[in-house]
Protein backbone atom coordinates (compact mmCIF):
# COMPACT_ATOMS: atom_id res chain seq x y z
CA UNK A 1 0.00 0.00 0.00
CA UNK A 2 1.40 3.41 -0.97
CA UNK A 3 1.71 6.29 1.47
CA UNK A 4 -0.90 8.21 -0.52
CA UNK A 5 -3.37 5.33 -0.30
CA UNK A 6 -2.89 5.21 3.48
CA UNK A 7 -3.41 8.97 3.70
CA UNK A 8 -6.58 8.82 1.64
CA UNK A 9 -8.05 6.02 3.76
CA UNK A 10 -7.29 7.95 6.95
CA UNK A 11 -8.61 11.26 5.59
CA UNK A 12 -11.87 9.67 4.46
CA UNK A 13 -12.27 7.58 7.66
CA UNK A 14 -12.90 4.31 5.82
CA UNK A 15 -12.97 1.02 7.72
CA UNK A 16 -12.20 -2.22 5.83
CA UNK A 17 -15.34 -3.85 7.22
CA UNK A 18 -18.50 -2.63 8.92
CA UNK A 19 -21.36 -4.04 10.95
CA UNK A 20 -24.29 -2.73 8.85
CA UNK A 21 -26.75 -2.67 11.76
CA UNK A 22 -24.28 -0.82 13.97
CA UNK A 23 -23.58 1.72 11.22
CA UNK A 24 -27.30 2.28 10.81
CA UNK A 25 -27.63 2.94 14.54
CA UNK A 26 -24.57 5.21 14.66
CA UNK A 27 -25.69 7.38 11.77
CA UNK A 28 -29.31 7.58 12.89
CA UNK A 29 -28.08 8.72 16.32
CA UNK A 30 -25.87 11.33 14.63
CA UNK A 31 -28.89 12.75 12.80
CA UNK A 32 -30.92 12.78 16.02
CA UNK A 33 -28.18 14.40 18.07
CA UNK A 34 -27.73 17.22 15.59
CA UNK A 35 -31.41 18.11 15.70
CA UNK A 36 -31.53 17.91 19.50
CA UNK A 37 -28.59 20.32 19.66
CA UNK A 38 -30.18 22.76 17.21
CA UNK A 39 -33.60 23.23 18.75
CA UNK A 40 -34.68 25.84 16.20
CA UNK A 41 -34.71 23.20 13.45
CA UNK A 42 -37.60 20.88 12.62
CA UNK A 43 -35.76 18.37 10.47
CA UNK A 44 -33.95 17.64 7.24
CA UNK A 45 -34.30 18.06 3.48
CA UNK A 46 -32.82 15.80 0.80
CA UNK A 47 -33.31 15.35 -2.92
CA UNK A 48 -34.38 11.80 -3.76
CA UNK A 49 -33.07 10.46 -7.08
CA UNK A 50 -34.10 6.83 -6.75
CA UNK A 51 -30.47 5.71 -6.49
CA UNK A 52 -28.59 3.92 -3.72
CA UNK A 53 -27.12 6.89 -1.88
CA UNK A 54 -30.19 9.11 -1.57
CA UNK A 55 -32.39 6.11 -0.76
CA UNK A 56 -30.08 5.04 2.07
CA UNK A 57 -29.76 8.50 3.57
CA UNK A 58 -33.48 9.18 3.22
CA UNK A 59 -34.32 5.98 5.10
CA UNK A 60 -31.84 6.71 7.89
CA UNK A 61 -33.22 10.22 8.21
CA UNK A 62 -36.84 9.10 8.35
CA UNK A 63 -35.95 6.60 11.06
CA UNK A 64 -34.25 9.41 13.00
CA UNK A 65 -37.19 11.83 12.85
CA UNK A 66 -39.68 9.06 13.63
CA UNK A 67 -37.71 8.15 16.75
CA UNK A 68 -37.44 11.79 17.83
CA UNK A 69 -41.18 12.30 17.42
CA UNK A 70 -41.93 9.15 19.41
CA UNK A 71 -39.44 9.97 22.16
CA UNK A 72 -40.82 13.49 22.54
CA UNK A 73 -44.52 12.70 22.00
CA UNK A 74 -44.70 15.17 19.13
CA UNK A 75 -44.95 15.33 15.35
CA UNK A 76 -42.70 18.38 15.04
CA UNK A 77 -39.72 16.64 13.48
CA UNK A 78 -39.87 15.92 9.77
CA UNK A 79 -37.96 14.67 6.77
CA UNK A 80 -38.77 16.39 3.49
CA UNK A 81 -37.92 14.28 0.46
CA UNK A 82 -37.68 16.28 -2.74
CA UNK A 83 -38.27 15.14 -6.30
CA UNK A 84 -36.13 17.40 -8.50
CA UNK A 85 -36.58 16.40 -12.14
CA UNK A 86 -35.28 18.32 -15.12
CA UNK A 87 -38.34 18.06 -17.35
CA UNK A 88 -39.44 14.42 -17.49
CA UNK A 89 -37.30 12.04 -15.44
CA UNK A 90 -36.81 8.72 -17.24
CA UNK A 91 -36.33 6.74 -14.02
CA UNK A 92 -39.18 8.41 -12.16
CA UNK A 93 -40.53 4.98 -11.18
CA UNK A 94 -37.38 4.37 -9.13
CA UNK A 95 -37.93 7.65 -7.29
CA UNK A 96 -41.50 6.63 -6.52
CA UNK A 97 -40.30 3.22 -5.31
CA UNK A 98 -37.74 4.90 -3.04
CA UNK A 99 -40.47 7.14 -1.64
CA UNK A 100 -42.65 4.10 -0.91
CA UNK A 101 -39.73 2.45 0.88
CA UNK A 102 -38.78 5.52 2.93
CA UNK A 103 -42.24 7.03 3.56
CA UNK A 104 -40.98 10.61 4.04
CA UNK A 105 -42.87 12.96 6.34
CA UNK A 106 -43.41 15.23 3.36
CA UNK A 107 -42.68 14.98 -0.38
CA UNK A 108 -42.25 18.07 -2.53
CA UNK A 109 -41.67 18.23 -6.28
CA UNK A 110 -39.75 21.08 -7.90
CA UNK A 111 -39.08 20.81 -11.63
CA UNK A 112 -35.79 22.60 -12.25
CA UNK A 113 -36.02 22.78 -16.07
CA UNK A 114 -37.41 26.30 -16.33
CA UNK A 115 -34.83 27.72 -13.89
CA UNK A 116 -31.87 25.93 -15.50
CA UNK A 117 -32.89 26.90 -19.02
CA UNK A 118 -33.35 30.51 -17.91
CA UNK A 119 -29.83 30.57 -16.44
CA UNK A 120 -28.31 29.11 -19.61
CA UNK A 121 -30.22 31.64 -21.73
CA UNK A 122 -29.11 34.55 -19.53
CA UNK A 123 -25.48 33.46 -19.74
CA UNK A 124 -25.76 33.04 -23.49
CA UNK A 125 -27.13 36.58 -23.68
CA UNK A 126 -24.01 37.77 -21.87
CA UNK A 127 -21.82 36.05 -24.43
CA UNK A 128 -20.99 33.04 -22.25
CA UNK A 129 -21.40 29.72 -24.04
CA UNK A 130 -22.45 26.95 -21.67
CA UNK A 131 -21.45 23.47 -22.83
CA UNK A 132 -23.67 20.48 -22.17
CA UNK A 133 -21.27 19.42 -19.40
CA UNK A 134 -21.49 22.85 -17.73
CA UNK A 135 -25.26 22.79 -18.11
CA UNK A 136 -25.14 19.59 -16.07
CA UNK A 137 -23.44 21.56 -13.30
CA UNK A 138 -26.22 24.15 -13.57
CA UNK A 139 -28.73 21.37 -12.94
CA UNK A 140 -26.88 20.14 -9.86
CA UNK A 141 -26.61 23.65 -8.42
CA UNK A 142 -30.25 24.45 -9.15
CA UNK A 143 -31.29 21.30 -7.31
CA UNK A 144 -29.26 22.30 -4.28
CA UNK A 145 -30.61 25.86 -4.46
CA UNK A 146 -34.15 24.48 -4.36
CA UNK A 147 -33.30 22.28 -1.37
CA UNK A 148 -31.91 25.23 0.56
CA UNK A 149 -34.98 27.30 -0.28
CA UNK A 150 -37.23 24.57 1.10
CA UNK A 151 -34.96 24.12 4.12
CA UNK A 152 -35.22 27.83 4.86
CA UNK A 153 -39.00 27.78 4.57
CA UNK A 154 -39.36 24.83 6.98
CA UNK A 155 -36.43 25.54 9.35
CA UNK A 156 -34.57 22.43 8.25
CA UNK A 157 -31.00 21.40 7.46
CA UNK A 158 -29.95 20.18 4.02
CA UNK A 159 -28.38 16.74 3.81
CA UNK A 160 -25.75 15.57 1.34
CA UNK A 161 -25.13 12.03 0.13
CA UNK A 162 -21.34 12.33 -0.14
CA UNK A 163 -19.57 9.12 0.89
CA UNK A 164 -15.99 7.91 0.68
CA UNK A 165 -16.24 6.31 -2.76
CA UNK A 166 -17.56 9.61 -4.11
CA UNK A 167 -15.30 11.86 -2.07
CA UNK A 168 -12.09 10.13 -3.16
CA UNK A 169 -12.81 10.98 -6.80
CA UNK A 170 -14.46 14.34 -6.19
CA UNK A 171 -17.36 13.07 -8.27
CA UNK A 172 -19.87 15.79 -7.51
CA UNK A 173 -20.57 19.37 -8.52
CA UNK A 174 -18.91 22.01 -6.38
CA UNK A 175 -21.64 24.01 -4.64
CA UNK A 176 -24.15 21.66 -6.24
CA UNK A 177 -24.69 18.15 -4.88
CA UNK A 178 -21.42 18.71 -3.00
CA UNK A 179 -23.05 21.42 -0.86
CA UNK A 180 -24.90 20.50 2.32
CA UNK A 181 -25.10 21.05 6.07
CA UNK A 182 -24.51 17.42 7.06
CA UNK A 183 -23.01 14.45 5.21
CA UNK A 184 -24.11 11.45 7.32
CA UNK A 185 -22.80 8.83 4.87
CA UNK A 186 -19.23 10.11 5.01
CA UNK A 187 -16.74 7.32 5.72
CA UNK A 188 -18.71 4.61 3.93
CA UNK A 189 -17.74 3.15 0.60
CA UNK A 190 -20.23 2.03 -2.02
CA UNK A 191 -20.51 -1.64 -1.04
CA UNK A 192 -20.93 -0.73 2.64
CA UNK A 193 -23.88 1.50 1.77
CA UNK A 194 -25.39 -1.41 -0.13
CA UNK A 195 -24.92 -3.67 2.91
CA UNK A 196 -26.86 -1.19 5.02
CA UNK A 197 -29.73 -1.07 2.53
CA UNK A 198 -29.88 -4.87 2.54
CA UNK A 199 -30.13 -4.75 6.34
CA UNK A 200 -32.95 -2.21 5.99
CA UNK A 201 -34.87 -4.54 3.62
CA UNK A 202 -34.68 -2.11 0.72
CA UNK A 203 -36.02 -3.27 -2.67
CA UNK A 204 -33.07 -4.79 -4.52
CA UNK A 205 -33.43 -2.79 -7.73
CA UNK A 206 -32.75 0.46 -5.85
CA UNK A 207 -29.29 -0.57 -4.64
CA UNK A 208 -28.42 -2.68 -7.69
CA UNK A 209 -29.20 0.21 -10.03
CA UNK A 210 -26.24 1.37 -12.11
CA UNK A 211 -25.03 4.64 -10.51
CA UNK A 212 -25.35 7.72 -12.72
CA UNK A 213 -25.34 11.46 -12.10
CA UNK A 214 -27.55 11.81 -15.21
CA UNK A 215 -26.69 15.48 -15.68
CA UNK A 216 -25.82 15.64 -19.38
CA UNK A 217 -28.41 15.98 -22.15
CA UNK A 218 -26.02 14.64 -24.81
CA UNK A 219 -25.09 11.59 -22.73
CA UNK A 220 -28.19 10.76 -20.65
CA UNK A 221 -27.77 8.31 -17.77
CA UNK A 222 -24.00 8.17 -18.33
CA UNK A 223 -22.74 5.56 -15.82
CA UNK A 224 -20.48 6.97 -13.10
CA UNK A 225 -17.94 4.23 -13.76
CA UNK A 226 -17.67 5.19 -17.42
CA UNK A 227 -17.19 8.85 -16.54
CA UNK A 228 -14.58 8.02 -13.89
CA UNK A 229 -12.64 5.41 -15.85
CA UNK A 230 -12.67 3.07 -12.86
CA UNK A 231 -15.29 0.83 -11.22
CA UNK A 232 -16.81 1.27 -7.78
CA UNK A 233 -15.57 -2.20 -6.92
CA UNK A 234 -12.01 -1.05 -7.62
CA UNK A 235 -12.59 2.14 -5.63
CA UNK A 236 -13.96 0.14 -2.70
CA UNK A 237 -11.00 -2.25 -2.80
CA UNK A 238 -8.64 0.73 -2.78
CA UNK A 239 -10.44 2.35 0.15
CA UNK A 240 -10.36 -0.90 2.12
CA UNK A 241 -6.58 -1.00 1.82
CA UNK A 242 -6.48 -3.84 -0.66
CA UNK A 243 -4.26 -4.15 -3.70
CA UNK A 244 -5.75 -2.96 -6.98
CA UNK A 245 -4.38 -2.91 -10.51
CA UNK A 246 -1.72 -0.24 -10.94
CA UNK A 247 -3.63 1.64 -13.66
CA UNK A 248 -6.77 1.75 -11.48
CA UNK A 249 -4.71 2.92 -8.51
CA UNK A 250 -3.20 5.73 -10.60
CA UNK A 251 -6.65 6.76 -11.80
CA UNK A 252 -8.11 6.88 -8.27
CA UNK A 253 -5.14 8.74 -6.80
CA UNK A 254 -5.16 11.10 -9.78
CA UNK A 255 -8.82 11.96 -9.18
CA UNK A 256 -8.09 12.49 -5.48
CA UNK A 257 -5.21 14.91 -6.06
CA UNK A 258 -6.98 16.81 -8.84
CA UNK A 259 -10.12 17.37 -6.75
CA UNK A 260 -8.52 18.42 -3.46
CA UNK A 261 -10.14 21.85 -3.86
CA UNK A 262 -13.58 20.23 -3.70
CA UNK A 263 -12.94 18.66 -0.31
CA UNK A 264 -11.53 21.81 1.27
CA UNK A 265 -13.33 25.03 2.11
CA UNK A 266 -12.61 28.37 0.53
CA UNK A 267 -8.88 29.04 0.35
CA UNK A 268 -7.43 31.76 2.56
CA UNK A 269 -3.99 33.24 2.97
CA UNK A 270 -3.41 30.88 5.90
CA UNK A 271 -4.12 27.59 4.10
CA UNK A 272 -1.22 25.39 3.06
CA UNK A 273 -2.86 22.29 1.54
CA UNK A 274 -2.80 23.64 -2.02
CA UNK A 275 0.94 24.39 -2.15
Curated annotation (Swiss-Prot):
It catalyses: deamido-NAD(+) + NH4(+) + ATP = AMP + diphosphate + NAD(+) + H(+). It holds the Pfam family NAD_synthase. SUPFAM superfamilies: Adenine nucleotide alpha hydrolases-like (SSF52402). Keywords: ATP-binding, Ligase, Magnesium, Metal-binding, NAD, Nucleotide-binding. InterPro entries: NAD/GMP_synthase, NAD_synthase, NH(3)-dep_NAD(+)_synth, Rossmann-like_a/b/a_fold. The keyword NAD applies. Disulfide bonds: none annotated. It is an enzyme of class 6 (ligase). ATP binds at residues 47-54, 161, 190, 212. Its EC number is 6.3.1.5. Mg(2+) binds at residues 53, 166. GO terms for molecular function: ATP binding; glutaminase activity; metal ion binding; NAD+ synthase (glutamine-hydrolyzing) activity; NAD+ synthase activity. One of its GO terms (biological process) is NAD biosynthetic process. GO terms for cellular component: cytoplasm. Pathway: Cofactor biosynthesis; NAD(+) biosynthesis; NAD(+) from deamido-NAD(+) (ammonia route): step 1/1. CDD domains: NAD_synthase (cd00553). Deamido-NAD(+) binds at residues 141, 174, 181, 261-262. NCBIfam families: nadE, PRK00768.1. Catalyzes the ATP-dependent amidation of deamido-NAD to form NAD. Uses ammonia as a nitrogen source. HAMAP family: NadE_ammonia_dep. Belongs to the NAD synthetase family. Homodimer. This is NH(3)-dependent NAD(+) synthetase. It comes from Oceanobacillus iheyensis (strain DSM 14371 / CIP 107618 / JCM 11309 / KCTC 3954 / HTE831). The lineage of its organism: Bacteria, Bacillati, Bacillota, Bacilli, Bacillales.
Amino acid sequence: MSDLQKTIIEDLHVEPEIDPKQEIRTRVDFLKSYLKKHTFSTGYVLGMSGGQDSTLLSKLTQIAVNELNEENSTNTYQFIGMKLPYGVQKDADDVDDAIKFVEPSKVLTVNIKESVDASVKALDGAGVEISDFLKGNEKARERMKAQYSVAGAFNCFVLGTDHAAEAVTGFYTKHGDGACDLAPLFGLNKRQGKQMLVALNCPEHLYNKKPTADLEDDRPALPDEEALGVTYEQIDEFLEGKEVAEDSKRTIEGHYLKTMHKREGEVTLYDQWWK
